[in-house]
Amino acid sequence: MTSSRLPVLLALVFSSLSPVLSHSNREMWFQDLFPPNTCPINAKTKTFYGIMFDAGSTGTRIHIYTFVQKSPEILPELEGEIFESVKPGLSAYADQPEKGAESVKRLLDMAIDAVPPHLWKKTPVVLKATAGLRLLSEEKAQALLSEVKEVFEESPFLVPEDSVSIMDGSYEGILAWITVNFLTGQLSGQNQHTVGTLDLGGASTQITFLPRFEETLKESPTDFLTSFEMFNSTYKLYTHSYLGFGLKAARLATLGALNTEVADRQMFRSSCLPKQLEAEWHFGGVKYRYGGNKEGETGFKPCYLEVLKVVKGKLHQPDEIRGSSFYAFSYYYDRAADTNLIDYEQGGVLEVRDFERKAKEVCDNMERFSSASPFLCMDLTYITALLKEGFGFRDNTLLQLTKKVNNIETSWTLGATFHLLQSLGITY
């Protein structure tokens, strides 16, 4: 569990959002994003909290945010964040929704300790599920969400009508982009040099950036673009979420097991795995048996050819990103840290080619890395192919890998929490 204290005037970003030009569904979403509130006269300093759950494919995470607003004329400050997570994700409980809800309750108990009792009834709690639940059938996903809703309703916190939901992947990208660029100071002042964001989850991956060239806007699919006003400027973002292209979904795709009815004792094999390996892996409530190619080749080259089939020609490649810089998090960060490309606590800056170099080292010497995840070669090779062949990044494209910016988690959850507080009229 971590806690941080940092005054951040994030509300300046979010309270000024308004739709200008957008894909139809997103236009409706942004219209409702932050309704105006009436500021009382002679109001005193107030402290308020927001509880946001991120129900991802590999784990469930709770973010407990503390805000302070000194007067109606001064925007709220982000005073601190408490963060914790549990594994596996809700989707692993697809056939046991009650157990999935129990994992949420364990995290919610932390909030009971963190939020003062006199503010419980004024503190909203919301869970937004991402790609893991999008991959489940509607019936199983709704069963999980219903159980979580019961846990919320039995708690002392404020439970909005839409307290549990499955969030569109593109909104993850939008909110994460706003959060990262605000926390890095890219949205203030006259000289704005925004950075793009790359998020690699277990089941999906997102890319979001601010196009600099009109050609990008003209050549991009219309549903990859969304616009809003902020700081008296209009931002037209390129953003898209690719379901099925997260790290763990890509493992299944490489093995030939994605969207496949798994037969009893069926074995999935890959040249990305150690030759003599035979093991079991549970993902999304399904058990998979996997192993290496005992008689075939192993190593980076045959592995890359396998992974290439998963990404080649499947993703849109805007030309201008080749010369842009991006913040990358989630599994980009984790795999880089696992292989000492970056410091686990501090993060670091890499070039795209650094992932390829490390993938070759791991894949061509699998025995040396046998104590690490058996999927390490496959994961690094997939990240390499995703960045180069999927998105079209150059070898020398710079990636800033980070878990936090100014001690705040790089996550869509902060933006979603402001949406929540504004929509409920909890801020002035």
From Swiss-Prot:
Reaction catalysed by this enzyme: a ribonucleoside 5'-diphosphate + H2O = a ribonucleoside 5'-phosphate + phosphate + H(+); GDP + H2O = GMP + phosphate + H(+); UDP + H2O = UMP + phosphate + H(+); IDP + H2O = IMP + phosphate + H(+)
Pathway it works in: Protein modification; protein glycosylation
GO terms for cellular component: endoplasmic reticulum; extracellular region
Positions glycosylated per UniProt: 232
Cofactor(s) named in the record: Ca(2+); Mg(2+)
EC number per UniProt: 3.6.1.6
Record keyword Iron-sulfur present: no
Record-annotated active site: 172
Record keyword Oxidoreductase present: no
InterPro entries, A to Z: GDA1_CD39_NTPase
Matches recorded under Pfam families: GDA1_CD39
Disulfide bonds: 272-303, 363-377
Domain of life: Eukaryota
Family stated for the protein in its record: Belongs to the GDA1/CD39 NTPase family.
Quaternary structure and interacting proteins, as annotated: Monomer; active form. Homodimer; disulfide-linked. Homodimers are enzymatically inactive.
Function of the protein: Hydrolyzes nucleoside diphosphates with a preference for GDP, IDP and UDP compared to ADP and CDP. In the lumen of the endoplasmic reticulum, hydrolyzes UDP that acts as an end-product feedback inhibitor of the UDP-Glc:glycoprotein glucosyltransferases. UMP can be transported back by an UDP-sugar antiporter to the cytosol where it is consumed to regenerate UDP-glucose. Therefore, it positively regulates protein reglucosylation by clearing UDP from the ER lumen and by promoting the regeneration of UDP-glucose.
Protein's name in the database: Ectonucleoside triphosphate diphosphohydrolase 5
Gene from which this protein is expressed: ENTPD5
